[in-house]
């Protein structure tokens, strides 16, 4: 009889945001598959949970599949987590979920924190429809093309970005999307949480004045204005 794959959302900054069900899922799993065993190990230690950990990240997901699928088909319960938030959203795990479901292994979501939704609801921008596009490409030419794809979309747009590329991404977003309302959310749920609201041009100027921001960043951009 197959085991079960639990897709467990974990805190994006504040450990108190882990749900009782999430904690129970981690405590009851036979194995925790995670991006960084050190990071997840520290979180589990703070929760008083001691479980075997197996790294699962973008560079080894295909190589890990046989081992994890064998565990699931042998009846083991595997909890899948990312470093923070809900797995699969710009994080590894999709291949595992797809293959497990295709083999008849039960897959359950244990919902909880999500940087995407947290940033969206505090952005003061229309919450739906929205499109989450993940991280822009690191190279300038591809990044410009990436933003251009969304220039006429009448959805609120949500992007992740690393602090050291934020200024360049804002330059390209202004060039391709125009100067429309936007919000930058950083260090969500943490002590130094900050939400910057304005237009893309105003946010670009603020980042240029302050220098590189610290912490994870979510950029939320208003829908394209009506044509004409």
Language-model segments: which ranges?
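A contiguous loop/helix-start segment that scaffolds small-molecule binding in enzyme catalytic cores
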Residues: 2, 76-77, 156, 160-228
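Glycine/small-residue-rich loop that forms an oxyanion/phosphate-binding "nest" at active or ligand-binding sites
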Residues: 57, 65-114
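Alpha-helix capping/helix-boundary segments
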Residues: 38-40, 85-86, 115, 165, ...
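Conserved helicase motor
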Residues: 55-62, 136-140
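Class I SAM-dependent methyltransferase SAM-binding "motif I" and its flanking Rossmann-like core
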Residues: 95-153
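Short acidic active-site motifs
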Residues: 63-68, 142-146
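Short active-site oxyanion
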Residues: 26-32, 104-108, 156-157
